[in-house]
């Protein structure tokens, strides 16, 4: 017997999501207008909490759908306007270009990356050394590339590793579905679970590595560039001014990487199963035997494009997204990828997240229109100069862990600059606050996927369900890093930032905003 119209509509609404999740979203959509009529400020914070809930439940339903419904309702009931949403999207166009083109550009360099990381994986047997290598590599790359780009690289490598073993374990060859474990016998499943744990730990080490490296340079994160422009700093100035905080944090972050692997804490310490190593070794041997001169030329071309990518980003020759577009054009033209459908596959990973980030900008518009952060900013600026550094750092960290760190950094640096221009704080204090804002925005935000766009990208990627990386597990695995990075950063802001900056200024190393 065919189901009723109502039942059919309920099943279609958010598809396979659990009934309790669908019901929760309906409750949100029903109560929001009434709360907004009663108290817009409370309604604004409630909307932020609801959006965070949809992100936390990313594996139940992709957040674009429920988050998008909440955003549409927010515009309809007047929490913000469509014009303001457009302004936020326009202001963050370079971030969207980055997602659309840079992430897709990396897709066409996967052969080279898989080759390099396979050699790295097979040549380093110590899990601690391998984890450290992934963390250091991610940190170094993130100093020149955006963290999203680096995470996209590591995701593509991990999916490649996983796919190689899953094909062997399922005995289904090229027709293998990586999400389907039904054809894998119990023995292989045990090994597969261990392999998942191994990949989870590598992904988290690499993800945190992007935060460690990304905070150090003005091109490491989008908000870094905004803060550098506001303070009038160039590449070298930015690096030196951040170094009293970022260098100790980097050292302690790498020590944390070694400690959690050694002690097998927080889900770390899983080693690469020998059976998987053998499969990957065989794959590598076969790949090398089958590699034709044409294939070798492709690898060389991809390596040259990689050099162009790092050089263009380091010298900031163009916007990051446009450099990514140049990578797509060069990589496809010089490696013979000419079919539209083959090129289209490169965009399947990044475009859903681009749409999700656009939805997020509408939530940002609500935050601005409802002045949700105003009480916090007023409270901080009323404190003493020394306390301001600590408070800016802590409030940036708190808000960045639940909100977009680009937005938080932008709001705070604009408020700090306005305070300087109005005479509320000195130029010297503003420059110290800029460091506190940048480090506070970047370091504590590793606590949750909400704060780091790279973490959110990982959580909502095709890899997350393969290696069973949920929101809760990601928060748990990030916890030791969150504690160490936040505390060391706070201590450095409190005790080393001002004297180290004063010393570098007297030595003539630092430029000052005129």
From Swiss-Prot:
The keyword Cell membrane applies. GO terms for molecular function: sodium:proton antiporter activity. Its main location: membrane. It comes from the Bacteria. It is a multi-pass membrane protein. GO terms for cellular component: plasma membrane. Keywords: Antiport, Cell inner membrane, Cell membrane, Ion transport, Membrane, Sodium, Sodium transport, Transmembrane, Transmembrane helix, Transport. It catalyses: 2 Na(+)(in) + 3 H(+)(out) = 2 Na(+)(out) + 3 H(+)(in). The chain crosses the membrane at residues 23-43, 63-83, 97-117, 120-140, 144-164, 202-222, 238-258, 303-323, 357-377, 391-411, 447-467, 475-495. Belongs to the NhaB Na(+)/H(+) (TC 2.A.34) antiporter family. HAMAP family: NhaB. Na(+)/H(+) antiporter that extrudes sodium in exchange for external protons. This is Na(+)/H(+) antiporter NhaB. The lineage of its organism: Bacteria, Pseudomonadati, Pseudomonadota, Gammaproteobacteria, Enterobacterales.
């Amino acid at each position: 017997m065919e189901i009723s119209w109502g039942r059919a509509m309920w099943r279609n609404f958010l598809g396979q999501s659990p009934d309790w999740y669908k019901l929760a979203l309906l409750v949100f959509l029903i109560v929001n207008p009434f709360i907004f009529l009663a108290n817009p400020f409370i309604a604004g914070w409630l909307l932020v909490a609801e959006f965070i809930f949809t992100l936390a439940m990313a594996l139940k339903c992709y957040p674009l759908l429920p988050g998008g419904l909440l955003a549409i309702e927010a515009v309809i009931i007047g929490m913000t306007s469509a014009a303001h949403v457009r302004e936020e999207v326009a202001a963050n166009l370079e971030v969207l270009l980055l997602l659309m083109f840079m992430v897709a550009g990396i897709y066409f360099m996967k052969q080279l990356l898989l080759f390099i990381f396979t050699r790295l994986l097979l040549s380093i047997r110590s899990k601690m050394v391998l984890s450290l290598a992934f963390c250091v590599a991610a940190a170094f790359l993130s100093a020149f590339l955006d963290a999203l780009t680096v995470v996209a690289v590591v995701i593509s490598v991990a999916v490649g590793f996983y796919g190689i073993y899953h094909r062997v374990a399922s005995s289904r060859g090229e027709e293998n579905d990586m999400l389907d474990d039904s054809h894998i016998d119990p023995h292989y499943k045990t090994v597969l679970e261990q392999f998942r744990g191994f990949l989870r730990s590598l992904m988290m080490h690499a993800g945190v590595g992007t935060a460690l490296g990304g905070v150090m340079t003005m091109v490491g994160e989008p908000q870094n560039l905004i803060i550098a422009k506001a303070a009038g700093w160039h590449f070298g100035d930015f690096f030196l001014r951040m170094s009293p905080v970022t260098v100790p944090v980097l050292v302690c972050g790498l020590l944390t990487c070694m400690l959690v692997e050694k002690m097998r804490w927080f889900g770390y310490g899983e080693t690469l199963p020998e059976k998987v190593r053998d499969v990957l070794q065989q794959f590598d041997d076969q790949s090398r035997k089958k590699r034709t001169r044409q294939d070798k030329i492709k690898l060389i071309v991809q390596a040259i494009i990689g050099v162009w990518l790092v050089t263009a980003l380091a010298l900031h020759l163009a916007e990051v997204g446009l450099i990514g577009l140049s990578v797509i054009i060069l990589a496809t033209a010089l490696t013979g990828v000419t079919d539209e459908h083959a090129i289209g596959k490169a965009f399947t990973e990044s475009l859903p997240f681009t749409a999700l980030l656009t939805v997020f900008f509408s939530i940002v518009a609500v935050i601005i229109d409802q002045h949700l952060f105003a009480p916090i900013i007023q409270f901080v600026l009323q404190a003493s100069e020394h306390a301001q550094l600590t408070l800016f750092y802590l409030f940036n960290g708190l808000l960045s862990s639940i909100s977009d760190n680009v937005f938080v950094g932008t709001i705070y640096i604009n408020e700090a600059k306005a305070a300087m221009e109005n005479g509320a704080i000195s130029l010297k204090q503003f420059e110290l606050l800029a460091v506190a804002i940048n480090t506070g925005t970047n370091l504590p935000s590793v606590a949750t996927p909400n704060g780091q766009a790279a973490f959110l990208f990982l959580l909502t990627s095709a890899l997350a369900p393969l290696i069973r990386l949920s929101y809760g597990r990601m928060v748990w695995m990030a916890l030791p890093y969150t504690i160490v990075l936040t505390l060391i950063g706070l201590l450095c802001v409190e005790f080393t930032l001002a004297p180290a900056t004063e010393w570098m200024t007297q030595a003539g190393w630092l430029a000052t905003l005129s």
